[in-house]
């Protein structure tokens, strides 16, 4: 079996496999660690193995290379990109910063290494609120690139001086209020867990505050926040508004509970480019290595380390 070959090879070559929550089940099954962007960044920094095989999209492998400069980072497919990280270029960011010279720039980890090297702080969906709260309130903030996460953070923190870039994740932007309304009508006892990148987040927050959902519990959480919440909650049925790959891990860890995607079509084609066959080829051929130029990596590391110190 291919799975057995992968497990054998990674042991022989002393390679650690990190996989994002959105990876296909066969890839999650061979990983040493499965998690969100923040959790995997931390694992990359502390694992003892000198080679990391990163099963996720390209910016995640770059982040692993930045936080682990003494390790070799491989990715099974160099073409596994990200519509959100592509929504801002370094030239656009530099121009934006020039227009707001006294502002603090806070960038989602879903950005390229070059973008990170221009930031004051990185953040993830699980710590964005903490990062913004750590910045003096009188300071203007440039938040990029996800407009739905940015709007959520501005609302939670009460910041009136946040400029928000108009980028989006095409998968999360596709999870609309209509998807949620339909599930609310169909599933009277379900609890809703919603990723802050979703386009339904802001209207949902308004409706929760107004008491519109009555007995429905609605939580807005990062993917790892979702994992922790569903395991602790007494609810038996959950509607999950994020990329559908996370449902596999949820069902594995909570077999007695039911998990329903808010949108069955919420699949990231870039995440799904990483297959078990490509993982095997990457291990066997020891490719494709992800390298970040030292000058860019050193600057980007500062923004990431500031984030990790707050988290």
Give residue ranges: language-model regions.
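Active-site loop-to-helix "anion-binding N-cap" substructures in soluble metabolic enzymes
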Residues: 1-241, 246-311
């Amino acid at each position: 079996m291919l799975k057995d070959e992968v497990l054998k090879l990674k042991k022989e070559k002393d390679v650690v496999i990190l996989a994002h929550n959105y990876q296909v089940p066969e890839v999650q099954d061979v990983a040493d660690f499965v998690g969100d962007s923040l959790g995997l960044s931390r694992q990359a920094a502390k694992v003892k193995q000198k080679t990391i095989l990163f099963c996720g999209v390209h910016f995640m492998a770059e982040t692993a290379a930045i936080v682990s400069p003494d390790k070799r980072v491989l990715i099974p497919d160099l073409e596994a990109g990200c519509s959100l990280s592509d929504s801002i270029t370094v030239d656009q960011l530099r121009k934006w910063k020039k227009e707001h010279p006294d502002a603090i720039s806070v960038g989602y980890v879903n950005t390229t290494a070059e973008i990170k090297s221009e930031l004051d702080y990185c953040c993830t969906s699980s710590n964005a609120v903490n990062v913004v709260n750590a910045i003096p309130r009188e300071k203007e903030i440039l938040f990029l690139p996800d407009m739905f996460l940015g709007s959520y953070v501005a609302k939670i923190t009460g910041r009136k001086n946040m400029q928000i870039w108009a980028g989006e994740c095409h998968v999360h932007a596709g999870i609309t209020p209509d998807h949620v309304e339909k599930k609310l009508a169909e599933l009277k006892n379900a609890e809703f867990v919603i990723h802050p990148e979703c386009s339904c987040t802001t209207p949902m927050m308004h409706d929760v505050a107004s008491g519109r959902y009555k007995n429905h519990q609605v939580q807005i959480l990062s993917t790892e926040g979702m994992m922790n919440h569903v395991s602790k909650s007494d609810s038996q049925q959950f509607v999950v508004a994020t990329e559908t790959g996370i449902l596999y891990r949820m069902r594995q860890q909570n077999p007695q509970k039911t998990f329903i995607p808010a949108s069955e079509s919420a699949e990231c084609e870039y995440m799904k480019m990483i297959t078990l066959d490509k993982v095997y080829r990457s291990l066997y051929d020891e490719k494709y290595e992800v390298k970040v130029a030292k000058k860019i990596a050193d600057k980007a590391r500062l923004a990431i380390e500031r984030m990790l110190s707050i988290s």
